[in-house]
Amino acid sequence: MSTIYEIPCVKGFIRMCNDGWLQGWHERNGGNLTYRMTGEDVAACRPYFDAEPREWVNMGVQADNLAGEYFITTGSGKFFRNVEPDPIHSIGIVEINDKGDSWRIVWGLADGARPTSEFPSHFMNHSVRKAATNGANRVIYHCHATNVIALTYILPLTDRDFSRALWQSATECPVVFPEGVGVCPWMVPGGADIAMATSEKMKTYQAAIWAQHGLFASGPDFDITFGLAHTIEKSAEIYVKVLSMGGGLIRQTITDDDLRAIAHDFGVTLNKNFLD
């Protein structure tokens, strides 16, 4: 590889940032993305690391199962629209110390930039999802998905109500996220409260919705994670359009028996708490 940008994990990270920007989910500096690197990723990127790593910064959170890991992360205050044309200032790689409570920049985030302000929240959720998936989960993605946010103004803010609405709005949804989605009430972004609330939801779900704020999605790779967010947002868009066209009247929908039939044929297990 002649540049770090040709390494698959970095190339995929940049592409996902641009995909989200093209969807319209990342106005200004909205949203953030982190990826937990494999050993092979780190080995491939190491020749491009800074000659001298920057100082350690305590996160205020701690996770034993992430000690010594490396993450690619978007930068605080950085715009997703600038990731592709200017990655060196927009994204970076951070190393976690052996106590699992501090990071230091080893590449990128040039000229004094820092990891996303939501990094502690991402970090806690990486810890939860790594444990829940036996290490398979590697991506945490937060975006301002327009129709998902719109639904948080009209639907009851419960896991059940949102999961059913999304499942019944697009046939693929019960296959893509059979466990449903979690919902968190409005909280101040970037704080410990929203990090804790989200990590509790992510023990059960691949995705959590932040009321009046956006979507938090996870997965084993960039394609699966972006696909999850895209599927949830498209289903929300369908539901918004149905409500708008019919004045709130829904004449027919995917029934609970239909959902069970989908689960049977596709070999997935639906969250029974969300079925009538």
Labelled PLM ranges:
Residues M1-D276:
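Glycine-rich flexible loops
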